[in-house]
């Protein structure tokens, strides 16, 4: 990363957690940062990409990116709670949506330093994220729709998306099953993530996140259901 101009200034400690169920995460510890890796991830082909990904999160935090400002996220969620009365599950999935935005931004660094083999592995990784059948629960389906948009936008942003791939057909099946309104919202979500920029000022970033969250929340509160799931 440093050779590409993305220098992490603080010391970084790597550790393994045998009880961790996710692949890994990064956290601040005083003047240092720690990347915690699950034991099972040590054998994964994605290990190198995972470490790069977590280092990129640390870089964005050191840089002071609004996407990695926890207080800003709390401000947006607090405003939504006051206006809309968010439920716990809605809040959880909106935080997931914010994580998708964080990830697509930091992955600009990751994709820039990956080799060809790592890129192919990552394409398959994102393909496995795509859901093809809605659950019938609008809250969960809005979260799945956003995750599909993130996976597709991640590849389109780096010119790696294949329009005739199984991933593409699975996503189309999912979106069309939710109906015409969801198709329009999906297009907006995918475009928002594909074209998101890390250098917006605070006011611009707050406005963009506000619209992003409000659109997802509207989908969560939609009464639409699949006919065969009613």
Where do the model's predicted regions map?
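Auxiliary, metal-adjacent structural segments of Zn-dependent hydrolase domains
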Residues: 1-30, 42-44, 92-94, 217, ...
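Catalytic glutamate of the conserved HExxH
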Residues: 50, 54-58, 62
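Glycine-rich, often proline-containing surface loops adjacent to acidic residues and nearby aromatics
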Residues: 31-35, 84-86
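Pan-zinc metallopeptidase signature
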Residues: 118-230
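Short, solvent-exposed secondary-structure capping/transition elements
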Residues: 46, 61-70, 109-122
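Short helix/loop segments within enzyme catalytic domains
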Residues: 92-94, 101, 105-133
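Short pre-active-site segment immediately N-terminal to the catalytic Zn-binding motif
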Residues: 35-51
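Post-HEXXH active-site segment of zinc metalloproteases
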Residues: 45, 60-95
């Amino acid at each position: 990363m440093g050779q590409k101009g993305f220098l992490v200034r603080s010391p970084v400690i790597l550790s393994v957690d045998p009880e961790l169920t996710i692949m890994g995460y990064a956290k601040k510890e005083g003047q240092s940062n720690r990347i915690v890796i699950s034991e099972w991830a040590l054998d994964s082909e994605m290990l190198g990409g995972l470490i790069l990904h977590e280092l990129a999160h640390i870089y964005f935090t050191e840089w002071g990116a609004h996407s990695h400002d926890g207080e800003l996220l709390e401000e947006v969620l607090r405003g939504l709670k006051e206006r809309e009365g968010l439920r716990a599950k809605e809040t959880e999935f909106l935080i997931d949506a914010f994580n998708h935005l964080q990830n697509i931004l930091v992955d600009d660094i990751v994709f820039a330093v990956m080799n060809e083999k790592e890129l192919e592995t990552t394409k398959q990784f994102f393909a496995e994220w795509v859901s093809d059948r809605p659950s019938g629960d609008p809250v969960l389906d809005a979260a799945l729709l956003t995750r599909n948009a993130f996976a597709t936008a991640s590849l389109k942003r780096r010119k790696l998306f294949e329009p005739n791939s199984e991933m593409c057909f699975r996503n189309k099946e999912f979106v069309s099953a939710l109906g015409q309104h969801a198709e329009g919202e999906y297009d907006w979500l995918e475009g928002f993530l594909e074209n998101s920029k890390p250098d917006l000022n605070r006011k611009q970033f707050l406005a963009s996140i506000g619209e992003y969250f409000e659109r997802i929340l509207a989908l969560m509160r939609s009464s639409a259901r699949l006919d065969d799931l009613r």
